[in-house]
Regions:
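C-terminal structural segment of proteins
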Residues: 1-240
Length: 240
């Protein structure tokens, strides 16, 4: 039982990096001053976690990650924020990109390792962000979700990161597939391109009571387009 380890709880900021203890609960992510200021996408998405106040007050960011449940909310957001993780093992401490850890077998930690911290850079002041989630009821798991981070040069996309969750066993980072939109203006045609590319991105799809595979493929494109559209609008408001 690691629940009584105080060093795994809390949020700090030092030398331009934010460290979040693995046992920090979702409610803290929603309300912490550092997270709300520097990582507003994470604060917002933590409030969208299903299960009500019990899960928000007891569920932890580390548990959310290592459970590797495909319908959970936090992993796509942390991937869009380019998070690293710190892992403690008998041979020492290592740091790795979250995307690398998630891509490894299971959660990539092994039986003798422990996720201790999530490490992130603050979002840039000009960044726009959004988290879109489709779900059947207010407290249910998501059927499809997407996190987006953008920055603009005028009306042209200079940064575009999109990660789609709840449609496949693993979150899908669409950023490379959407690379061709960088330097292009955001308009209806760009939105249609995001939807088309992200709809075709999943190789295998979940098929369960939250939605069948055909519906999920369609919704992967929809949530991605909506997330980018909302993130662009956010960036435009921020930079007025």
């Amino acid at each position: 039982d690691i629940g009584a380890l105080p060093e795994l709880v809390g949020i700090t900021e030092k030398d331009g990096e934010i460290a979040i203890g693995a046992l920090t609960v979702h409610r803290t992510l929603q309300r912490d001053a550092i997270v709300c200021r520097a990582l507003p996408l994470l604060a917002y998405s933590a409030a969208q976690v299903g299960g009500g106040w019990q899960v928000h007050n007891r569920g932890t960011v580390g548990g959310n990650l290592v459970a590797m449940h495909p319908l959970y909310d936090i992993a796509p957001v942390l991937l869009a924020l380019q998070a690293d993780v710190e892992i403690q093992a008998p041979e020492g401490v290592r740091r790795a990109a979250l995307g690398k850890i998630l891509a490894e077998t299971s959660h990539g930690l092994g039986t003798s390792s422990l996720l201790t911290r999530i490490l992130l850079k603050p979002m840039t002041p000009d960044a726009g962000w959004a988290y879109e989630k489709l779900k059947i009821t207010a407290g249910s798991y998501g059927s499809a979700n997407a996190a987006a981070v953008v920055s603009l040069n005028g009306n042209k996309l200079s940064t575009l990161r999109v990660v789609i969750g709840a449609v496949s066993e693993q979150p899908l980072d669409a950023s490379e597939a959407l690379h061709g939109l960088l330097g292009k203006p955001w308009d209806a045609a760009a939105g249609a391109r995001v939807e088309s590319l992200c709809r075709e991105l999943p190789k295998t799809l979940l098929d369960d009571q939250q939605g069948d595979a055909t519906w999920r493929r369609a919704m992967a494109g929809v949530v991605a387009r909506r997330a980018v559209q909302a993130a662009v609008a956010n960036a435009q408001r921020t930079n007025k």
